[in-house]
Every structure is written in structure tokens, then in C-alpha cells.
Amino acid sequence: MQVVRESGVGYYVGDLAAGRAEETRVAGESPGVWVGGGSGVLDQRGEVDPVVFHQVLAGRDPLDDRPLRASRGDRSVAGVDLVFCAPKSVSVLHLLAPRELADAAGAAHQAAVADAVGYIERVAHGVRRRQAGVAHRVAATGVVAAGFVHRTSRALDPHLHTHLVMANVAQGVEGTWSATDTRRLFLHRRAIGSVYEASLRHELTSRTGIAWEPVTTTRANTVITSGRVPSIRWDVAGIDPVLLRLFSQRAASIDEFVHRRGGGRPSAGLRRTAFHIDRPDKDQGQTVDGLRSAWKSRAADFGIDPADLIRLVGRVRDAPPHAAVDNDLLAARLEHLATKRSWLAGRDVVAAVADASPSGLPAPVVERVAHTLGTAVAEHDGRALAQLTQLAQSPQPTLSRVSAQEPRWVAADVVRTVRSQFDPLVSSLDRIGGDSAVAERARAPVPRADRAHERAERARWDRLGPRTLDR
């Protein structure tokens, strides 16, 4: 996620006026389409017009050119770019697999981005209004955004990703336009990415029946049996690792860049820095069709026939059955977070639930599972339960979830609930949130063995005092 200035808008639409066919784009790739409820309010649908895109990012109404937000000249933020990147295995399917499977991978990616946009609009998008000298978050009519699908990396490897460029304008539900409140968006950026990836797994499995496997990275040292998982990533099961490494030149160049400058094992921060410093321009003279032929030839040099990728279809039927949410993975991920902070916010739980779903879940289901977990924790935490009640019974009808304090819980409480009570809640998604028997299981007494640790954590929480996430 990065800020977009008006001077950078041309990256997304700069080559559209040339009239290049969509299948031949490399640097600019797709012409882009308008997405989000706010775009509809501005009567912007379908393919992006470059002139209108510049106008909207400049904070002006494309219908009558009136200003939609205050302008601070060159200091104004035009928008925010959220990049949704498919795993390398999905990129390979989309650009090298036989047509039917390739199209399914592309459609699954598009559907997952749309699902993530829905999550943003429900949870992480809004505006700020001042009432009686007090600033409030107010719900908005939806995001004003354009999605640009790109299919190559800067090293010209298969790399399916979408730039979701959200304009820094939004209409509050009371009808007034202004700049957006991006603070909640930045707080939720980890959850947004996890929701996208879970939705992608769900969509692609539903369409093709492929199976998934967790990715163990050297940097993260992800070992499930250790009890703590720094990160959870998934790739399509059954793809030759050689094929994935063959088309990961950009990642390899970043690691080499860090190594040349005396870095050891490249951390996420070092990799981000290297990404921006060691960033080549895309070759405008290449076509996707030409690159696809070159990719297939390169794979053939290593004895790999991309046509064999079709055998991945339907593998989920042969895989051992698994829970919709892996309880051990969920607990391990939350335990890792608990080593870094004494409390967990709702967005942390959403991200963990999404990451721990082997075959993925739609965003609304991820939210429902996370809410079920939060409710189970709140049953044993009067403060958290009061927060949930306050959110549900806000006296101001214009305020939505984005306008109130996000609920949060003692991290140890969340981990304990997952370990001791949550397994029956996630074993059958059909029962989550709708079965009174399951709700009763969530209200089970806290094991006495955990009481001393619970009291210590709660005392630590009380010393911190009540704070909103704005601070």
C-alpha cells in the first residue's frame, strides 16, 4: 500500500491513449475499470477514461468539475494504491496453463479483489466529521477506485496482480464529499491482504477443484510444531517448485541486491527498501503473447511442459478432508502475535482466520468466524462485551463500524479461547453464528489452570488504560 501523488497518476493510464490492444500491454497492461460504490455515485462505471481518472484523482467531480475535497496543492494526496498480488503458483496457472484453467485463475483473482473491496467498504473506509468539537468517523457511500490488472513483474516474469487505486475522495452518508479517512485503511492493510488471499483460494478451488499447501519460508522459519507461526502463505499444491523458482527472477534480484550490500538474511523491511531502489522499468516493446511463448520455451528447457498443469484440476477431491479453518494454524498464528503485544484488535483476528483457512473462505464468512471468536472471548471479558454492545447500540445512526472504537481483547484470552473452545465453532461453518448449541459451547467456563495467567495479563491491560485505535 502506498500513497499516490498527482504526479504519479500517469503510471496507471499513461499509455491508454495510444490505443494498444489489451492483450499486447506490458507496462500499462489493462486499461482498468471503475469499482466501488463511490464510483457509482459519481456515475463512473466500466472502463476507465484517462481524462476522468486524472480529474477524480485531483479531487474534482467529473460531471461538473466542482471540488470534492480541499486541495493543498502539490502536498495533496491524490489517492492510495493497494496492490493485490496472486501467489506465484496462481500467476503461473493464469499465464502458462491451458486456456480453461488459465481463465479460471484470472476470474478467481478478479472475484477475490472484488471481495476485498467489499471488506474495505464494510470495515475500513469512511470519512471524518466534527460534531460539537469532537471528531467522529462516519460511514461513506463506498470507495471511489479503479482497478488495473497487470500480469508481469518488472523482470517480465508471470506476476498476476491488481493495482486498486482509491481516490482520496468519499461521500459521507449525510451527503457531503471530502477527503477520506485513510487511518483505518492503513490499520487494516494486513487484514485486507489476507482476506483477498483467502477469497482467491476459495474462488479457485470452487472453480477448478485444485488443492493448496502451506508455504514454508526460510526467513520466517515457519514450523507448525513450534507452536508459533510468524506468517502463513499458501500455494497451489502439485506445481513443480523448479517452475516457480524459474519465474521468480524479481524476488531473486531483490535478495541479491540486499546480499551485495552486506545484508544477511533479508528481512521484510530490507526487501521493501530494495524493491524501490532496485526497480527496473518495464519493457514497453514486449507483448504478453510474445512473453508467454518465451516462458513456455524456458520451461521446456528444464523439462517442464506447462500443458501438464491441467492435472491439478480436481486434486482437492483426492486430498484428505480438512476443517474450513485449521484450528492449530489459527492458534499458532495468534500465539505469535501474542508474543509481540498484550492485546489483539478485530482486524488481527480477521487476518489470522483468513490465513488459517486451507481452501479459503469468502470475506463475509471470514468476518463471521472472527466475530464468533470475538464474541466467545467477550463472554469472559466484561470490558470487551461492553464494547461490542456499544458498537451495536450506537445512538447516532450515521455512525457505522468505521466510526466507532474497534473492539480488542487481551491476546492471551483470544489464544486460550481458540485452544480450548473454538474448535467446535469452526468445524462446521454452517453452524457458526446460527446454532444456539454452538453459542453455548462458546460460553463454557474458563479452565482454572489459566486463571493466574489471565489475571496477570488483565492487570497489564488495565495499566495501559482505555485507548482508541486513533492514537
Regions found by a protein language model. Give the residues of each.
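Short, amphipathic alpha-helical interaction segments positioned at domain boundaries
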Residues: 388-403
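Short, positively charged loop/turn segments that connect secondary-structure elements
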Residues: 357-366
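Intrinsically disordered, flexible peripheral segments
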Residues: 1-332, 337-338, 345-354, 367-371, ...
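Intrinsically disordered, low-complexity regions enriched in polar/acidic and amide residues
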Residues: 1, 386-389, 420
